[in-house]
Amino acid sequence: MNEDVGDGWATSAAAWIAEQGEDGDYGRRFVLDTPMRARIEGRGFRNALDVGCGEGRFCRIMQRAGIRTTGIDPTEALLARARELDPDGDYRLGRAETMDFGASHDLVVSYLSLIDMPDLGAAIAGMVRALRPGGTLLIANMTSFNTAGPPEGWTRDHDGTPRFTIDHYMEERATWVSWRDMRILNWHRPLSTYMTLLLDHGLQLRLFSEPQPTGGTPEQIARHRRVPYFHIMEWQKPD
């Protein structure tokens, strides 16, 4: 049973699974996966918690890197797919806001899941609790100027030139976004909200990057360079 059916994920799960496949969508395949892999491989991480693991794709990537991984997600249909693809994996129904793993993980990952969490403060607190002292919190997130775009986002001006509209940037809000038979409730928050919550837990910022595309069509690459979708942050919990 889903922990929360009001965010669109339960009804969008089948379309999401079909779009992701094994390689992921454009953003994962051509923008995020390479730098995210670089942050987990060869660093001696023994165990990891993937918060908002969805269909388990990044859990499988971490396991192939030799990291024992637990994935949690509030959508049962996504977990069912994760277990189907990885029968020996550890996938659990749960939310970041209410999980309680104790300080037991070398690595906690949020791969494009913070925008789905209604109580960001509780979610980040849960992630920090799950880290052992000295552990790493690795976050891939949508940029806040991008999430400030909907409902207008990409439009065309009077001469047909594509423009991206940003508005109400400082106003935290939930917005329904729809694409390819999916309709999901996403949260916009200014970057300062994320940074303040993470800093208030005493975490130390070790990396902030805005990765560029490594492939895709010329149109996809050009659009991403004009209005980047993603950033990556790595934080360390003090010893």
PLM regions and their residue ranges:
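A short glycine-rich, Lys/Arg-flanked "PGG" loop and its adjoining helix->strand segment in the class I
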Residues: 121-136
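A short SAM/SAH-binding and catalytic strip from SAM-dependent methyltransferases
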Residues: 107-120
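Short alpha-helix
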Residues: 185-208
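A short acidic, Gly/Pro-enriched loop at the edge of an enzyme's catalytic core
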Residues: 99-108
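Core SAM-dependent methyltransferase catalytic element
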Residues: 201, 221-239
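Conserved class I S-adenosyl-L-methionine
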Residues: 1-43, 57, 78-81, 138-172
